[in-house]
Amino acid sequence: MRISSYFLYVTLFFLLLLPLGKAVAGWNSFIVNFDKSLYGKGAQTWKIAPYDDHWVYFANKNGMVQFDGNVWTVFPMNNFSDVRSVLASTTQKRIYAGGINEFGYYEPSEDGELVYHCMSDTLERDCRFVGNVWGIHEADNILYIQGDDRVVKYLNGKYTAIEMNAKIDCSNMVNGILYIGTDHGVWVLVGNTFFPLQGADILASNRIRGIIPHKGGGVIVVTAYNGLFYCNGRTTVPFVTGAEDFMCENEVFCVAAQDDKIALGTIHKGLLLIDCSTMDVKYFNENNGLRNNTVLSVAFDSRGNLWAGLDSGVDYVSLSSSFTNLYSYP
């Protein structure tokens, strides 16, 4: 039977000590470890998309994975490639997924089962080789599919491939504008043309890992080794958190933001959680409950709790729970 909220699931989980995972301490926040064997042994999870308080979708090595709070279900793509990205669209009532040279969407049939519809099969052959689809975004009835060196735009049944003369490492839709992070800095898409983000020249030599909105306008750009930067379209300045040395030493790989909180996943030392209202910093790693120190994806759910896709397995950090641990791991 589907559980209607993650909070209820996690609470029961802790109280009943279900054998599917284990709850351990992490700075007074419970962490639930989900082993990869629960969803077909696909190790890496590259993207996470919570949806409507009831489900979470994962871009996993084995396919698109659905979790309803109780049951894990794997949906492979037509070419059985790793799934790199997933987008839960509340407007279209679809789950978009991108793999390697393939993208499409899952939609409920009349009996409620998800059915896959491949979109990339309808592309002209020379546009079909998008490589790894690391990002899928939507705005103003336009769907954007980000590949290794191009973005495919889908509007009114028509595809437009927009090539970028650089490797695209990440992308995000912020206030209706598509930003991309490349090995040539940060760019924005205007119409069907990429333009460099004004005032952000100093980022051209950085490895860009993510771009998130800043509550005062502009964006925060996340780099792999050199911390965070605030860009307003005119100037770019460091966004100082006090965790710059940690980021430099452990290589930031992914980011998620919600309200005043920023979650950063690292390659070597787990999760970093920053509260921008107080600049308090918390760390979650193998020493205090995280299953694995290599974090490939992060996402907040609607309750403010945090999902982390690891190099092996998935973890759930219950940040909003009133339950706390009496003990911590060394």
Can you describe what each PLM-predicted range is?
Residues 1-330:
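Carboxylate-rich, polar loop motifs that coordinate divalent cations or form catalytic acidic clusters
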